[in-house]
Structures are given as C-alpha cells and as structure tokens.
C-alpha cells in the first residue's frame, strides 16, 4: 500500500464522536476497532490494556482476527512490539523483517504482513496499545500516524473517564444499599 493519507477530517470526526458518546468502554472499543478496519481498509484492529502487574497486554476489543490468533498465548509488553512503550508509534512494514513480534509464525499464518502499534497514553504513561494489522505491506503516511496518535490519546482519556464513571456508579449503588436511616446522611 502506498503512502497516502487514509484518515481525513470526516473519519476523524466519526471516530472522535464514537469515543465521546460512549459510557461503556467495551462498546466504545468494539465500535472503534470495527470502524477503523472498515475506514482504513485494513485486515484487523485490536485494542489492548496494559496489566501493570503482569506486564501483559489484555484485549479490550478486536475485529478481523481469528479466534486461533487471539488465543495464541499471552501478549507480553516486553516482547510484543516492545518499543511502543517508549511512547512512540511503531510501524512494521514487513513482519518477516523484524524481531519485535512475539508470535511471528502465527502472524504469517493469520495473513498479517504489516502492523502499526500506537501507545494509548494518559499523562505520558502508556495504558495500552492500539494495534492495526494489514494483509499487505503498509507504508503509513506521517499525517495518518499523527492522527492515530491523537486518536490513541483520546482513547486513553476515555479509558480513564469510563473507569472513573464506573467507580462513581459503584459508590452510588453501595450508598443506596445501606440501611434506610444511614443512606440519607451520606447524600447531603
């Protein structure tokens, strides 16, 4: 694929609205992975959250990959496109010519020829990874890479927002479950 811009302002608006209008992280990430695959004409997209304890990338949402590929084994942050955690997007134009892929054999069997990994960051800390897969060599334009970085930062904000919202809802439910004479005291 040549180096042409795929992300225009209309696509960026649709994607940004999908992020801003969702209160559910699972629905939002599933919608975004499907939207990106269709709009960019790529093979697949996966969003991962970093488990800080195990250093594994846990799948938030994925579209376009087989169950066999998704279940190939744990995706370790230090072995799978590890340089993305230095804070910059990584473009792998040919998966056969890199040592950054943890499961190269499975990637080839899946029909993956190239991939782009973009850190999902909040306040400079990586929370996860937005990963896009293509079935042919992919030379991503600088403008599209910049757009994907901004998108990933918005996803980071949305992840934090939905976690905060879920925490507040959980606290509200806990307060409402308290005995009748205690709950009103906490609401004032």
Show the residue positions of the predicted features:
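Allosteric cytosolic regulatory segments
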Residues: 149-157
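Signal-transmission linkers at sensory-effector interfaces
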Residues: 1-27, 168-184
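Regulatory sensory and allosteric helical modules in signal-transduction proteins
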Residues: 58-60, 67-102
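Short beta-strand-to-loop transition segments that serve as allosteric relay/switch motifs
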Residues: 129-138
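GAF sensory/regulatory domain recognition
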Residues: 34, 46-70
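Short regulatory alpha-helical segment in sensory/regulatory domains of signaling proteins that mediates
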Residues: 16-20, 32-41, 49, 108, ...
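A short, aliphatic-rich beta-strand micro-motif
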Residues: 113-121
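Signal-transducing coupling segments at domain and membrane junctions
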Residues: 93-114, 134
């Amino acid at each position: 694929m040549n180096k042409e811009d795929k992300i225009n302002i209309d696509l960026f608006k649709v994607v940004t609205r999908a992020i801003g209008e969702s209160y559910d992280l699972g629905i939002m990430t599933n919608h975004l992975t499907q939207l990106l695959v269709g709009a960019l004409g790529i093979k697949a997209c996966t969003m991962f959250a970093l488990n800080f304890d195990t250093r594994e990338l846990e799948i938030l949402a994925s579209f376009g990959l087989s169950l066999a590929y998704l279940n190939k084994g744990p995706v370790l942050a230090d072995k799978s496109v590890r340089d993305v955690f230095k804070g910059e997007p990584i473009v792998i134009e040919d998966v056969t010519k890199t040592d950054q892929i943890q499961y190269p054999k499975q990637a080839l069997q899946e029909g993956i020829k190239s991939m782009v990994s973009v850190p999902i960051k909040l306040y400079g800390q990586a929370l996860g990874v937005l990963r896009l897969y293509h079935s042919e060599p992919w030379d991503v334009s600088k403008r599209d890479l910049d757009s994907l970085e901004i998108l990933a930062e918005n996803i980071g904000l949305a992840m934090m927002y939905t976690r905060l919202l879920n925490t507040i809802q959980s606290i509200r439910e806990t307060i409402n479950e308290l005995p009748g004479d205690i709950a009103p005291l906490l609401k004032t």
